[in-house]
């Protein structure tokens, strides 16, 4: 059995389908990158037989992923370990060579946004209808100190605009939080609901996909946010994910 074959089986498994929708999307994204990784002689990792996977190959793969960032590489390492552990449980393979590779330590970022940076970003994002949802995601993450992933998937059911409060069960810690909505943010949300209240997401992509409005993906959000940041003349050191620490 090849890695790609195991991946197809895993997507049909109880283990995968019992995950949260957001987690499933993340797994599919990262596992797709893992299986398309070229290591030796342009051969993709997904085309290797499970019996041909070695610790050396795992190490070379991880080193290549680290070229795109240690945190990114560690995400890939986590999902390939999950996949191969599933393979062991199903008796498709006997060992998980990626379990032998020590992850590198991620250096924690200390970059924060200045208030004037936030204002410039929001002014730029809100000046164009196409980027208004990106501005809302950023403003909500900033005001409530919440993860971008949670704000990206926030639904109208989470909001009480009359009482100006938000309810959320955090995706990572599973904690329930109730937070006030400022007058400025509430005004933007009312405007957003007037335009997008017919569907479930607070800050969807501006155009429908296959007949329905979808949230921004984990990949697209930072890319499109970077374009807004460049238009606003902000430093390349800033990341949208830094907002919750600001």
Residue ranges, per PLM feature:
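Short basic/aromatic active-site micro-motif
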Residues: 133-135, 235-246
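N-terminal core-binding DNA-recognition domain of tyrosine recombinases/integrases
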Residues: 8-22, 31-109, 123-125
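Basic, Lys/Arg- and aromatic-enriched nucleic-acid-binding interface segment
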Residues: 74, 89, 93, 99-148, ...
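Conserved tyrosine-mediated DNA breakage-rejoining catalytic core shared by Y-recombinases
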Residues: 108, 117, 144, 153-194
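C-terminal catalytic core of tyrosine-transesterase DNA break-rejoin enzymes
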Residues: 71, 89-90, 139, 143, ...
């Amino acid at each position: 059995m090849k890695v790609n074959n195991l991946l197809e089986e895993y997507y049909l498994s109880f283990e995968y389908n019992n995950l949260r929708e957001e987690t499933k999307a993340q797994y599919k994204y990262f596992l797709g990158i893992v299986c398309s990784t070229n290591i030796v002689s342009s051969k993709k990792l997904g085309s290797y037989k499970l019996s041909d996977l070695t610790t050396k190959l795992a190490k070379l793969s991880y080193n290549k992923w680290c070229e795109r960032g240690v945190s990114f590489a560690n995400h890939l390492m986590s999902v390939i370990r999950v996949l191969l552990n599933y393979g062991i449980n199903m008796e498709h393979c006997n060992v998980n060579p990626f379990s032998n590779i020590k992850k590198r330590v991620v250096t924690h970022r200390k970059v924060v946004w200045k208030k004037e940076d936030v204002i410039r970003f929001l002014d730029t994002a809100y000046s164009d209808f196409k980027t208004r949802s990106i501005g809302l995601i950023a403003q909500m993450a900033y005001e409530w100190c919440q993860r971008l992933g949670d704000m990206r998937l926030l639904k109208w059911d989470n909001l009480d605009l009359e009482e100006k409060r938000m309810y959320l069960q955090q995706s990572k810690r599973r904690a329930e939080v109730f937070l006030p909505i400022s007058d400025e943010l509430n005004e933007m949300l009312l405007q957003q609901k007037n335009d997008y209240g017919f569907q479930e997401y607070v800050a969807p992509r501006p155009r429908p996909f296959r007949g329905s409005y979808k949230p921004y993906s984990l990949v697209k959000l930072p890319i499109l946010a970077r374009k807004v940041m460049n238009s606003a003349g902000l430093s390349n050191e800033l990341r949208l994910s830094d907002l919750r620490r600001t």
